[in-house]
Amino acid sequence: MRKLGILAMLLCGIAIQAQSRLDKDYKDIEDKVIEWRRYFHEHPELSNREFKTAEKIAEHLKSLGIEVETGIAHTGVVGILKGKKPGKVVALRADMDALPVTERNDLPFKSNATSEYMGEEVGVMHACGHDTHVAILMGVAEVLSKNKDKIKGTVKFIFQPAEEGAPPGEEGGAALMVKEGVLKNPDVDAIFGLHINSQTPVGMIRYKSGGTMAAAQVFEIKVKGKQSHGSQPWSGVDPILISAKIIDGLQTIVSREMNLTNEAAVITVGKISAGVRSNIIPESAEMIGTIRTLDYDMKDKLNKRMVEMVSTIAQAYGGEATCTITEATDITYNHPELVEQMLPTIKRVAGAENTVAQKAVTGAEDFSYFQREVPGFFFFLGGMTPGNTESYPHHTPDFRVDDSGLLLGVKALTEMSLDYLNSNKTPRLDVKPKG
């Protein structure tokens, strides 16, 4: 009995020593992570154009002695870190791309970058926090490379381009990375990822088991009318009027035909184009938009009704219209067993009081493509300054997050990786997620 007590004390001492070493590494890396984040914020690049971002990431990984592969899915970077002992393979993912948004923030590291997007010169900004994701994962790579002796297995660092969507006519993002074999050689057993959130206080982690973020689809509606003089609408068929009726009708599908007590659904028209002059009723109009759903049956019903409604409304006003729907991302599905397995780690790192279960959100994430292949866990990291009552929404010129929240992301991904690799549990994706 006494020997068992001595052994327990020795093991406890080793664990404390190991944690103390990690804590020192975290302290040493924090300023670097903030510096990297600010560099990437000041030098953003659009989807599939993350050339300099990828170059800086690859340079850092190589300096750590990590095996590096570049050019995956255009600009993607993958690093492979093998531990002291063989074992499972865990992947960690960060997205790299920025958005065509002109920054309004008055920051010392404000983006003044511009680029061409869909034929127009636009401002470029990390308006969704991908700069923080890259910096965090670079920090995790450095901490883990200093602690290879603690790693039983392999860590694969995935720096992904084009999460916001590839430019028209191009492939990209997580789907292309999967297609090009990013989860193979070595085969990944589980994948973790995070997203900074400007409406969650620094120090907090939010999560959900099961369906967490919505499936996203893109729709294009083409309306054909009959051109006429603006002073004689009776001699033509007005595609702008038809478009207005269609937009109104689409919202009734959500409000009157979907059971929103089960799951949320959203139809948003994001762009409408028609006409060239104030006194000409044009021949045609076009609309594009997004659909968000968290239930596959609801998604199928909504798609069917959209196509029917667009056509019948146009016919009712003497015109024609078609609705084409394409897939963008699947439901982001957190594997319940993996969530249960990793929650103690997150609570240890963030504190139980700062680890909060949340409801599903209608935002979408192409991290879902990885989760279709292997069990995954995607969570939200607080980025709102403590005490603030005002947040800065994602995808806007005013978006901002507090750098002081980044270190928690480094700690969470580092210790989730170590705990997962050192555990005997390996949840399997026996059946692909169905919402």
For the regions a protein language model found, what residue spans apply to each?
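Bacterial Sec-dependent N-terminal signal peptides
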Residues: 1-21, 435
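Acidic/His- and Gly-rich active-site-bordering loop/insert found
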Residues: 19-125, 135-152
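Extracytoplasmic/secreted proteins, especially bacterial periplasmic and envelope-associated proteins
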Residues: 21, 28, 32-35, 39, ...
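Soluble non-cytosolic domains of exported or imported proteins
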Residues: 27-31, 44-55, 127, 131, ...
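Divalent metal-coordination and catalytic microenvironments
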Residues: 40, 79, 92, 130, ...
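Metal-dependent amide/peptide-bond hydrolase catalytic core
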Residues: 63, 244-435
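Hydrophobic beta-strand positions in extracellular immunoglobulin-like domains
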Residues: 81, 223-225, 291
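Histidine/acidic-residue-rich, glycine-tolerant segments that coordinate divalent metal ions
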Residues: 113-125, 131-132, 143-144, 149-271, ...
